[in-house]
Design a protein with these regions (language model features):
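Long, low-hydrophobicity, acidic/polar, solvent-exposed interaction domains
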Residues: 1-104
Length: 104
């Protein structure tokens, strides 16, 4: 799962490779990204044979996201018990997607 952090407290997420599916526009909190993290983790667990196959989350912050946005998403990693995550640079294609949706 990749999570894109944008300006105006906006975020988008997608599963799999970039460009293969349209990102889902979401928000912070229990009915937003938290629900998506929990639901996607269950789906990954159900579709992979071994119980130790955990969902991996890639966090990508756009230039207009804030430190508070990053802290909030890291809090969500802890709350939802996501054990494997990384903060990596955002790609130009992902920046374009954020811009298209008004978050960059």
């Amino acid at each position: 799962m990749s999570i894109l952090l944008g300006g105006k407290n906006g975020l988008e997420w997608y599963m799999g490779e970039p460009g293969k599916s349209a990102p889902t526009i979401d928000h912070y909190g229990k009915d937003g990204i938290r629900k998506a993290l929990i639901d996607n983790a269950k789906q990954v667990e159900a579709t992979h044979a071994a119980p130790d196959n955990l969902m991996e989350v890639v966090i990508k912050a756009g230039p207009k996201s804030t430190y508070q946005n990053l802290v909030a998403i890291l809090d969500e990693m802890k709350i939802t018990n996501v054990q494997i995550y990384a903060i990596v640079p955002i790609t130009q294609m992902e920046l374009d997607e954020l811009k298209k949706n008004g978050y960059n």
